[in-house]
């Protein structure tokens, strides 16, 4: 059998032509306060750095959520449909999904991620470890366009369980989070479920340390986005002319990650387009909203889902919510 036949199925639902994606990126950089969509963090190097972030002492979300899952895995699995289609949104290296396979016994694993090459290697590793399990990779900017109806309809007797761990939902503005969860709801039918992690409100010092670690890994991750922009736009950002900045905004209840210009300079963004940065000028790269448990339940309800079960840690730092169609 050829190597190609051994590889798991890989599909793409990317909708915008590359030129339109570039135009959106350029428009964000030309706003009065420049913006770069956080999806551009995740080139191959960015994925590697984020994996490193998840191992940091300061970055509590990963280990706290992992402990909640470890302590409650069987109880959570007992609330899920039998032999579901396990849909891992933003699956990365698929490590979190691997930990669920024995407990959930899915009929199929669907890994969804925007980083195509990284996704292919990740889903192939799952397929190699579980040769009897159907594994499908979907290259998708799923935060904007979730289009899995046809794929899920191939197995009408296996309802989907959407798995969205890691508090990534916090990267959306609350209204955008509602619209995103509504798109998940539209894929659930009557029996589908959403298993989602959300970071909870806590003291500012703990939050800020998680996004500005002493060893500088998060800073490297944030600065790497400029290398991605250079590749996408043929721009000439020099990352060394910016520094990482992360603070908690009390009014909006969110961490804000930015890049701050160290000095006045100019950047070529496109062939005939330049952007001038003054010293101290910011580029917004990420928001991470924090919720109380009740606020997040209300968000699920506004999105057409009912929270049926909730698990947290001893300190109430992180919440895992299981929701079904309302």
Language-model region placement:
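N-terminal auxiliary segments of SAM/dcSAM-dependent transferases
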Residues: 1-40, 47
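Class I SAM-dependent methyltransferase Rossmann-like catalytic core
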Residues: 34-80
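Conserved class I S-adenosyl-L-methionine
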Residues: 83-92
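Conserved SAM-binding loop of SAM-dependent methyltransferases across substrates and taxa
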Residues: 93-105
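Conserved SAM/SAH-binding beta-strand->alpha-helix loop
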Residues: 115-116
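A short glycine-rich, Lys/Arg-flanked "PGG" loop and its adjoining helix->strand segment in the class I
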Residues: 178-190
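Conserved beta-strand signature within the Rossmann-like core of class I S-adenosyl-L-methionine
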Residues: 187-201
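Substrate-binding/catalytic lobe of Class I Rossmann-like enzymes that use SAM or dcSAM, i.e.
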Residues: 208-289, 297-303
């Amino acid at each position: 059998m050829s190597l190609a036949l051994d590889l798991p199925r890989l599909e793409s639902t990317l909708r915008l032509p590359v030129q339109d994606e570039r135009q959106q990126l350029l428009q964000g950089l030309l706003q009065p306060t420049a913006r770069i969509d956080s999806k551009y963090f995740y080139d191959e190097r960015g994925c590697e750095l984020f994996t490193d972030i998840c191992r940091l002492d300061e970055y509590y979300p990963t280990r706290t959520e992992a402990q909640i899952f470890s302590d409650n895995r069987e109880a959570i699995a007992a609330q899920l449909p039998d032999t579901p289609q396990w849909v891992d949104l933003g699956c990365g290296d698929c490590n979190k999904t691997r930990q669920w396979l024995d407990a959930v016994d899915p009929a199929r694993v669907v890994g969804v991620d925007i980083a195509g090459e990284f996704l292919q290697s990740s889903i192939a590793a799952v397929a190699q470890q579980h040769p009897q399990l159907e594994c499908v990779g979907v290259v998708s900017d799923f935060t904007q366009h979730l289009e899995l109806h046809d794929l899920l309809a191939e197995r009408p007797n296996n309802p989907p369980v959407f798995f969205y761990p890691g508090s990534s939902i916090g990267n959306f503005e609350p209204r955008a989070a509602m619209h995103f969860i509504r798109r998940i709801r539209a894929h659930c039918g009557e029996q589908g479920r959403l298993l989602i992690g959300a970071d909870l409100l806590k003291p500012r010092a703990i939050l800020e340390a998680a996004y500005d670690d002493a060893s500088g890994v998060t800073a490297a991750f944030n600065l790497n986005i400029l290398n991605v922009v250079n590749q996408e736009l043929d721009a000439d950002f020099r990352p060394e002319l910016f520094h990482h900045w992360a603070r908690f905004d009390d009014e909006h209840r969110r961490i804000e990650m930015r890049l701050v210009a160290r000095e006045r300079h100019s950047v070529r963004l496109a062939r005939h387009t330049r952007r001038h940065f003054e010293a101290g000028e910011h580029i917004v790269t990420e928001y991470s909203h924090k919720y109380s448990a009740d606020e997040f339940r209300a968000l699920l309800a506004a999105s057409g889902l009912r929270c049926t079960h909730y698990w947290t840690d001893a300190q109430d730092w992180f919440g895992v919510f299981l929701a079904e169609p309302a």
